[in-house]
UniProtKB/Swiss-Prot annotation:
Alphabetical list of SUPFAM superfamilies matching this protein: Pseudouridine synthase
Catalytic residues as annotated in Swiss-Prot or TrEMBL: 55 (nucleophile)
The protein, known as: tRNA pseudouridine synthase A
Oligomer and partners: Homodimer.
GO terms, molecular function: RNA binding; tRNA pseudouridine(38-40) synthase activity
Gene3D superfamilies: Pseudouridine synthase I, catalytic domain, C-terminal subdomain, Pseudouridine synthase I, catalytic domain, N-terminal subdomain
Any matching Pfam family: PseudoU_synth_1
Binding of substrate, residues: 113
InterPro entries assigned: PsdUridine_synth_cat_dom_sf (IPR020103), PsdUridine_synth_TruA (IPR001406), PsdUridine_synth_TruA_a/b_dom (IPR020097), PsdUridine_synth_TruA_C (IPR020095), TruA/RsuA/RluB/E/F_N (IPR020094)
Record key words, sorted: Isomerase, tRNA processing
Length: 256
């Protein structure tokens, strides 16, 4: 009897070439499928389907995948089995048996990303893989003033990297906020939206940092929506500071 599993993953993206499987590359999908197929011991290969891709160096606190497993096993048994086989930079943090029409990508209602920025003149060696570093002066009040402009439904063409396969660049951001983590001397950005374009969060963060540094006017996002020109927002924040925090679904879609 085949069972469909919804699995939530946390991973350190430093040594992964992104989420999606690629030839001769160590990816999150590769190590997860390796563990699942080892547990299955069947000739038919089991494929994992993710809620979306993360790039090389990008981390996840709550990436979601689904797959169909050919043997009866409890959710707890699956969680323990996978974690006994996965490398130390990838962990299953939650596991559920879900209906066969649940799809990790196509039934999602939104995603939440974090971006952490470390401060200081020099790069902290213990943060270099887990934050983006910004050494220049910042007025966080200017950034806070700009954050409402990030929210809403807009054409984010100025904030998408080349290589995007999206047919439309219109997205809705329900919530955008920034706050200081004074204990770690970091600035944290948080974005919750119905979906995000290729490198969108990293480009938006780089643009907001330029606003905080006085290189751009506070409400420059409004102009960038109008011009729809990536060359007007050239900078991209490093992958190391980006975290996929959570993927949202309707609880009804997960009920058996």
């Amino acid at each position: 009897m085949t069972q469909r599993f919804k699995v939530t993953l946390a991973y350190d993206g430093t040594n992964f070439a992104g989420f999606q499987a690629q030839p001769n590359q160590r990816t999150v999908q590769f190590v997860l499928e390796k563990a699942i197929n080892k547990m299955s011991k069947k000739d038919e290969y089991i494929t994992v389907y993710g809620s979306g891709r993360t790039d090389s160096g990008v981390h996840a606190l709550g990436q979601v995948v689904h797959f169909d497993f050919p043997h009866p096993i409890s959710a707890k048994g699956m969680l323990r089995g996978l974690n006994s086989m996965l490398p130390l930079d990838c962990e299953v943090v939650d596991c559920k048996i879900v209906p066969n029409d649940f799809h990790s990508r196509y039934t999602t209602h939104g995603k939440r990303y974090l971006y952490r920025v470390s401060r200081g003149e020099f790069v902290n060696p213990f943060k270099r893989l887990y934050t983006g570093h910004y050494k220049y002066p910042l007025d966080i009040e200017k950034i806070k003033e700009a954050m409402p402009d990030v929210e809403g439904t807009h054409d984010y063409s100025s904030f998408v990297a080349s290589g995007s396969q999206a047919k439309s660049h219109v997205r809705t951001i329900y919530e955008a906020k920034v706050y200081e983590d004074k204990v770690n001397d970091e600035i944290v950005f948080e974005f919750y939206g119905n979906g995000f374009l290729y490198n969108q969060v990293r480009i938006m963060v780089a643009t907001l940092l330029e606003i905080g540094n006085g290189k751009r006017p506070v409400h420059d996002f409004l102009r960038l929506y109008e011009v729809k020109d990536r060359s007007q927002a050239r900078q991209t924040a490093p992958a190391s500071g980006l975290y996929l925090k959570e993927v949202y679904y309707d609880e009804e879609d997960e009920k058996l």
